[in-house]
């Protein structure tokens, strides 16, 4: 008898297919998992009614895939191309959970770049107004108050930056979320960085990562993201590096590459725009709102206050007509600060939320 973690079932099944003259007895659970996690034969999960006419066929497949993995408490990486609607696929899963969980409902946590936090709020309010959502913001005491009352909400959204600052509050709270979603999962590419260390300390029943870039581009990044969605699945980084990364990157070992692909394939779903081109609608324009970072806001407000007074004095002295050039110059400066303060201030090295969103 061989006992393996349940999440290695499909990998084992692929290996067994290559073994000849070997008799294997497979129990009911084994056969069920193999069948259900076949991406061509996903379990039929009921899509929430309001999404039936919104989700495109490939997005419905994404919903089924997320739900099937969650049924076994597996994690996964949704790696569709940018613009293919990863957010709405996740929202449909969150709504499905709320509809089907009658008792002991848990809160879910979405962690994103600060520039996308408001986008999550807007998308949820647009497509799933029944979800009670809260974006964590404010000073340290205000954020702590929200975290200590997370049970009041269906979904909490925070940024990677705030999660790093608040991690001790989460640990003290000791709450197990229903889902934790890591948006723009390339933020976890460095396993030793604070972003990755913080989010990996948060407890959840199921973990999913979203990224629009091919994760196979960097094997170290691949390992770090898997270490978040299913800790231990790709072993320790030391073992992963010696078994796969070194063999593939330095030695071009095709056998190691094939084995790694077999390992990760059930838990990564990636569709490109080219693959689903016939399902895509005509081009639409979406206005994304962006909130300035703390340092950027301080600079903007400081310049605004000083400039308003100067312009008022200028108008009082020379009249509106003669002051128009200075008014235009001031507006240009404010616009530059909104775009990126480095356009206005030399050696400005703080993050810029608008640039991050782009």
Where are these regions (language model features)?
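ASCE P-loop NTPase motor core, strongest for the SF2 helicase catalytic module
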Residues: 25-252, 261-358
